[in-house]
């Protein structure tokens, strides 16, 4: 019952301190109360003065030391389980002891409870106050497990002052407390107890490695990189500001000249109205003068009836009227509008001013050690840009090259019959000579081109098949060596008989030479030229060589 009362008193004291200091956590209040022996006034004064931060820092430092001691003296604590059991069984005088030892002894006592479950029945009454104590201490133990978060927040605030060590201490202490709470009860495995402590050290080293890498990168380069990043970000902001300023200036210019335009229009309207008034005034003056002249004219008509005095007065009036005619002239010639346009133009040209940006930036010559790096970077960037340009330009010729082999492959396909027929004609020259003396063959040869000419006139060249072109080329190519052979035989036979034969033989030679040159052209030209050169000579040679072929046929048969 005493322990329950003390627990209730602790809660009341925590609430009392929290009512004065509402922004502090229960963990911090418990630690400060334990430091001042649960004196509420001293704890509140410590929070108000700010000395509670130092108290919490001391708690963290002592927790680190106790954690280290606990790591080193695990075996000693297992040996002194009986002493700890006796301490737990005693009624607790007050919660003046620090809580980390209580948590440390809690699982130890729990282990002894399990180990002493086989004891005699006279020990069972002793277990009842211990269970009460465990139930009482459950909430403070949870509070101490939650101390780590509060301490981490405090130490993060303190780390800004340049003390990162307490943060590491709190983490080690919290890890040690949780590990001791979850520790198995078997004392015969000390290696398993120390393994979680060893596993914390590589994590600490891994956390330090990025800082070490940053230090290796350069002692002060990180600050420079941050400054450069801020400056580059501000450049985009200034660019937006310039655009906004230019837009606002354009709007101001439009507004100013619109106002000037409105002012000019208003002035024009006022001047036009004033000119109308001037016109009316001048006309009134002239009408008055006109009436005066008419009146004087009427008086002059009555001069015969007037006395001398009246005539003298009339002459004086007329003289005065005539003497004022110069004013009439001035009234007619006077310029009613005058304006110094040049001055106004000068004022308009001087109206408004635009401030141009000043390039106050200075170029700093880089150090000689940085020049190779800058040149290499510029060279690599230039190569990449050139490579991108070349790759973009080579895409189109590659397509043309991909299409050209098809055209090239079509050239041999169309010219293959001529290539194939020429060696065949050279090898089988004797057979061709034998075959050309067949009258049926000559009739077919002479009639075939005529038919082909008729069919060519009826249908378009695009409608003709490749087989028809090949059929025309083969007899045409086989027909040329016959002309050559016929010319040679003609020279041999008619050279001795008649002198007229050489004249006939020169004509086939010229035609043969023209045909040979036409055969060589298709290999250099396009496909269209091949078909044209193979078709046109057939139509010419068949009609002209018919008479020439009859001469060797007669001579050789004889």
UniProtKB/Swiss-Prot annotation:
Annotated coiled-coil segments of the chain: 271-344
Q: Basic residues: which segments have biased composition?
A: 63-79, 469-485
Listed Basic and acidic residues bias regions = 80-92, 513-522
Sequence positions bearing N-acetylalanine: 2
Its protein name is SPATS2-like protein
Modification Phosphoserine, positions: 120, 455
Q: What are the record keywords, sorted?
A: Acetylation, Coiled coil, Cytoplasm, Nucleus, Phosphoprotein
Which ranges are annotated Polar residues under compositional bias?
381-390, 410-432, 440-456
Give the principal location in a single coarse category: cytoplasm
The superkingdom of the source organism is Eukaryota
Instruction: Provide GO CC annotations from the record.
Output: cytoplasm; cytosol; nucleolus; nucleoplasm; protein-containing complex
Give the UniProt subcellular location, in the record's own words: Cytoplasm; Nucleus, Nucleolus
């Amino acid at each position: 019952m005493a322990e329950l009362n003390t627990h209730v008193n602790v809660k009341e004291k925590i609430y009392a301190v929290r009512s004065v200091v509402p922004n502090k956590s229960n963990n911090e209040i418990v630690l400060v109360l334990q430091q001042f022996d649960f004196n509420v006034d001293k704890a509140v004064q410590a929070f108000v003065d700010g000395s509670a931060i130092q108290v919490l820092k001391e708690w963290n430092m002592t927790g680190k030391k106790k954690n280290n001691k606990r790591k080193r003296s695990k075996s000693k604590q297992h040996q002194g389980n009986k002493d700890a059991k006796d301490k737990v069984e005693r009624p607790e005088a007050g919660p003046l002891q620090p809580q980390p030892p209580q948590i440390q002894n809690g699982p130890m006592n729990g282990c002894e409870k399990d180990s002493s479950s086989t004891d005699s029945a006279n020990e069972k009454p002793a277990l009842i106050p211990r269970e009460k104590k465990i139930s009482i201490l459950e909430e403070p133990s949870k509070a101490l497990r939650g101390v780590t978060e509060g301490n981490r927040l405090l130490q993060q605030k303190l780390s800004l002052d340049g003390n990162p060590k307490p943060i590491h201490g709190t983490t080690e202490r919290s890890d040690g407390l949780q590990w001791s709470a979850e520790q198995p009860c078997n004392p015969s495995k000390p290696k398993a107890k120390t393994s979680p402590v060893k596993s914390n050290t590589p994590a600490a080293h891994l956390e330090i490695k990025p800082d070490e890498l940053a230090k290796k990168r350069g002692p002060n380069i990180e600050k420079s990189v941050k400054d450069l990043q801020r400056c580059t970000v501000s450049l985009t902001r200034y660019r937006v500001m310039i655009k906004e300023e230019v837009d606002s200036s354009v709007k101001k210019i439009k507004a100013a000249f619109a106002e000037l335009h409105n002012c000019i229009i208003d002035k024009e309207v006022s001047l036009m109205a004033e000119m109308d008034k001037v016109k009316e005034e001048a006309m009134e003056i002239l009408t008055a003068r006109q009436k005066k002249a008419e009146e004087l004219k009427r008086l002059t008509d009555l001069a015969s009836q007037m006395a001398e005095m009246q005539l003298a007065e009339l002459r004086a009036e007329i003289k005065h009227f005539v003497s004022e005619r110069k004013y009439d002239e001035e009234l007619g010639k006077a310029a009613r509008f005058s304006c110094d346009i040049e001055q106004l133009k000068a004022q308009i040209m001087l109206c408004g001013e635009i401030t141009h940006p000043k390039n106050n930036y200075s170029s700093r010559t880089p150090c000689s050690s940085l020049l190779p790096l800058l040149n290499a970077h510029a060279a690599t960037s230039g190569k990449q840009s050139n490579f991108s340009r070349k790759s973009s330009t080579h895409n189109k010729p590659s397509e043309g090259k991909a299409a050209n082999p098809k055209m090239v492959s079509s050239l041999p396909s169309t010219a293959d019959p001529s290539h194939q027929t020429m060696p065949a004609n050279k090898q089988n020259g004797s057979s061709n000579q034998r075959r050309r003396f067949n009258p049926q063959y000559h009739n077919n040869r002479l009639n075939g081109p005529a038919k082909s000419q008729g069919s060519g006139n009826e249908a378009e060249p695009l409608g003709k098949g490749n087989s028809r072109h090949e059929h025309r080329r083969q007899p045409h190519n086989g027909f040329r060596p016959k002309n050559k052979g016929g010319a040679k035989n003609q020279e041999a036979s008619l050279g001795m008989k008649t002198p007229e034969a050489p004249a006939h033989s020169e004509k086939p030679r010229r035609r043969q030479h023209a045909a040979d040159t036409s055969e060589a052209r298709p290999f250099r030209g396009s496909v269209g030229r091949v078909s044209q050169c193979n078709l046109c000579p057939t139509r010419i040679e068949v009609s002209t060589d018919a008479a020439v072929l009859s001469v060797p046929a007669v001579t050789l048969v004889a």
